[in-house]
Amino acid sequence: MNPLTLVRETTAWVSGLSKHVKINNEALDKECEDFLNKHKIKAHKEIWADNWFHYCDIDIENKESTFTELTAKYILVLDTLNFCFWPDSEFEYHHLARGLKNALIANPKCFDADQLIKVTSETIHQWFGKDLPNTSERVRLIREVGTVLIEYFNGSIKEMILSANNKASVLVDLVTKYFWGFRDSAIYKGKQVFFYKRAQIFVGDLWGAYQGRGLGKFDDIKQLTMFADYRVPQILEELKVIEYSPELKEMIKNKVEIPVGSEMELEIRAVTVHVVEKMRDYFNKGHCELLALEIDWMLWGRGEAMLDKLPPHHRTLTIFY
């Protein structure tokens, strides 16, 4: 079955049963209408390639350049490590992206598969000038990426991407099939629920960096959902689009850890996915066609810009986001 359909359908199911997280449809409609009044057209390229902390060596006017794999290697490592920074209050996504960018500039071969299998905690420290939360898991996941690329794709990320035949759904399926660390699913009320956050964001980042060409060309990019993390629900709650139960709201306010796989955690993530689906449908009806991933990036960027003013986000120790 299409993995992106699984994400969309199972998260909608959880949203319909959710006890701790509800959608405020009136606030949702207001946010969408306000957006439509301000932005009739939104280009995706400004959101990814124009971020100074990202590495991107693509010359979009040069067809050969859109098939070079250095940026793709960077993106795979980036999204392998793109999870759970909150235990370190002084480390955010842009620190991760910039640290990897600097490492790649210093040594363009550092993200080759035969180098990834040798990564240690000392390597991580060298890349960022400090230890990251859960370093041992990050090392394991990076080594897994190198091992899989060597065993199944001749050490070539380009070969892996091209084997998907320009299908985002196929590439997400490949990533979750071969890289166990990307298998982001859980059990809710006895039923498996799928998110595939880091697998999807890997495809979305390729599309953004390569601007939908070469290694970033995906004919079904519209099928990607948003990437369920902790920043987007944080901004949605601030905008009153989602509402937490008193118990959950108090836990988040007091920075109490929400157990991974708990009903509360899964409802936060699933309802967030479903909200973005509803926003996308609203925009499309308003003749402003946006992808779920574009809405995700805009909400995430809005949350990052308001970081000092936002209430706490939920805290869950996980390797998935």
UniProtKB/Swiss-Prot annotation:
EC number: 3.2.2.-
Domain of life: Eukaryota
Record flagged with keyword Thylakoid: no
Reaction catalyzed: queuosine 5'-phosphate + H2O = queuine + D-ribose 5-phosphate
Entry keyword annotation includes Hydrolase: yes
Keyword set, alphabetical order: Hydrolase
Pfam families given in the database record: Q_salvage
Binding site for queuine: 227, 229, 296
GO molecular function, one term: hydrolase activity
Example of a GO biological process term: nucleoside salvage
InterPro entries (UniProt xref): Q_salvage (IPR019438)
Active site: 229 (nucleophile or transition state stabilizer)
Additional information: Eukaryotes lack the canonical genes for de novo biosynthesis of queuosine (Q), present in most bacteria. Therefore, this molecule must be sourced from ingested food and/or the gut microbiota, and metabolized to its corresponding nucleobase, queuine (q), before incorporation into cytoplasmic and mitochondrial tRNAs. Incorporation of q into the anticodon of some tRNAs contributes to translational efficiency and accuracy.
Known function: Catalyzes the hydrolysis of queuosine 5'-phosphate, releasing the nucleobase queuine (q). Is required for salvage of queuine from exogenous queuosine (Q) that is imported and then converted to queuosine 5'-phosphate intracellularly.
Family: Belongs to the QNG1 protein family.
Protein name: Queuosine 5'-phosphate N-glycosylase/hydrolase
